[in-house]
Amino acid sequence: MQLNPAEISELIKSRIEGLGVSANIRNEGTVVSVTDGIVRVHGLSDAMQGEMLEFPPTADGTPSFGLALNLERDSVGAVILGEYEHISEGDTVKCTGRILEVPVGPELIGRVVNALGQPIDGKGPINAKMTDVIEKVAPGVIARKSVDQPMQTGLKSIDSMVPIGRGQRELIIGDRQTGKTAVAIDAIINQKGQNMTCVYVAIGQKASSIKNVVRALEQAGAMDYTIVVAASASESAAMQYVSAYSGCTMGEYFRDRGEDALIVYDDLSKQAVAYRQVSLLLRRPPGREAYPGDVFYLHSRLLERAARVNADYVEAFTKGEVKGKTGSLTALPIIETQAGDVSAFVPTNVISITDGQIFLETNLFNAGIRPAINAGISVSRVGSSAQTKVIKGLSGGIRTDLAQYRELAAFAQFASDLDEATRKQLDRGARVTELLKQAQYSPLPISLMGATLFAVNKGFMDDLEIKKVLPFEHGLHQFLKSSHAALLDKIEKAKALDKDAEAELTAAITSFKKSFA
């Protein structure tokens, strides 16, 4: 059989034309150096700030990614997200053209994930239908709505003196071991049945502490509406830095669809330290306390994303699917101070960004006053307009009483003969202080909190011994639950006290007090 050269060339040509090879043009670079999770790459001329870079996979085939953070004249400085031991000089790095994205949606509820949204709770894969970028522009002024709906924490001292509204940013600040996490966890537990999705972001915490928090949430049934994002102390600084933005994106999913969400950042001091570590390794110039110049922007761009958005924004975002509903993302950032120094760099930054702060004091905590809230310097700038009517009406004098009591108590130590008015004020202050104590993981509903505040306002506790104040409150709650359940339901639904309810409550407390020994 003789082969014709013309036929052969035609055959080859047709084969080449029929070959379906897609050209994939991607910018590639070479690893120049790897140190402490920071990689310097040469040749990525088209890399964007914050772009994901693709590195060679690990030994078991897991893909490796990094974030381009430093764009220099002849190289790119990137941080590796995860393991970096397998990366060496000369490896090929590719641009992806994408910003870092994490899975979002209701599929994440009840799960514990890492900073990249990957499950770490051993409950199998998360089949999320959507992903979203971790860095987003916060809603503008026109898209926002004023904060006027309460976000009840269930803690008497906070809901009465430092009320928080949906869409507010309220800082929880204090030294280590003053109960900051406990306040935030109580707030999450109290959202049961309130149509609120919660996100708890643990940054730089011990793995055992995160496990304890997850266990507490499971026991309270709070994991049914909570997502836990964990970047423990053993993870890289890059993962700790990214985790807060990942959690925020997961919370924004619900806000943008006309739902309410609560996010706790525990804590932003450790995130700032992680960012400082990354910045110094990238050879960025250090500023005050060795933090980089953009550490304020680090927190402001995160916390500005917590907001209450109006119905027009939600309707436009969902393309008309959700109408007439506002959405909110409430943030409770936590900051750890050193020896009560709130004038340090990161605490002052976050205080100026947020809408108020709850200041927890070591002295109060050690004296058994828990939550250890300092009423004098704790403030909520927008929460009072969101406070429920019943609590607002009954808590007016409590803050003033407490602040004056602390002031008078300091002077009373040196004075032996006090006038009657001062003695009365000291007695009342001591009872209010005792009454605001609350056990951990036991938030109160509005009706029972209202009953407690009503009893103290009307002087039912003025003649009780201080050590009997909390037993009286506990007994009163049990009595009202068993004998006056309808009244509690009425207060819970109306969130206000009318004259009939007030008269019934007075009669109930009087009746209980007679039987209280």
Curated annotation (Swiss-Prot):
HAMAP family: ATP_synth_alpha_bact. InterPro entries: ATP_synth_asu-like_sf, ATP_synth_asu_C, ATP_synth_asu_C_sf, ATP_synth_F1_a_nt-bd_dom, ATP_synth_F1_asu, ATPase_a/bsu_AS, ATPase_F1/V1/A1_a/bsu_N, ATPase_F1/V1/A1_a/bsu_N_sf. Keywords: ATP synthesis, ATP-binding, Cell inner membrane, Cell membrane, CF(1), Hydrogen ion transport, Ion transport, Membrane, Nucleotide-binding, Translocase, Transport. This is ATP synthase subunit alpha. It comes from Variovorax paradoxus (strain S110). It catalyses: ATP + H2O + 4 H(+)(in) = ADP + phosphate + 5 H(+)(out). It is a peripheral membrane protein. It comes from the Bacteria. One of its GO terms (molecular function) is ADP binding. Produces ATP from ADP in the presence of a proton gradient across the membrane. The alpha chain is a regulatory subunit. Pfam families: ATP-synt_ab (PF00006), ATP-synt_ab_C (PF00306), ATP-synt_ab_N (PF02874). F-type ATPases have 2 components, CF(1) - the catalytic core - and CF(0) - the membrane proton channel. CF(1) has five subunits: alpha(3), beta(3), gamma(1), delta(1), epsilon(1). CF(0) has three main subunits: a(1), b(2) and c(9-12). The alpha and beta chains form an alternating ring which encloses part of the gamma chain. CF(1) is attached to CF(0) by a central stalk formed by the gamma and epsilon chains, while a peripheral stalk is formed by the delta and b chains. GO terms for cellular component: plasma membrane; proton-transporting ATP synthase complex. Gene3D superfamilies: 2.40.30.20, ATP synthase alpha/beta chain, C-terminal domain (1.20.150.20), P-loop containing nucleotide triphosphate hydrolases (3.40.50.300). It is an enzyme of class 7 (translocase). The record marks S378 as: Required for activity. ATP binds at G174, D175, R176, Q177, T178, G179, K180, T181. It is found in: Cell inner membrane. Its EC number is 7.1.2.2.
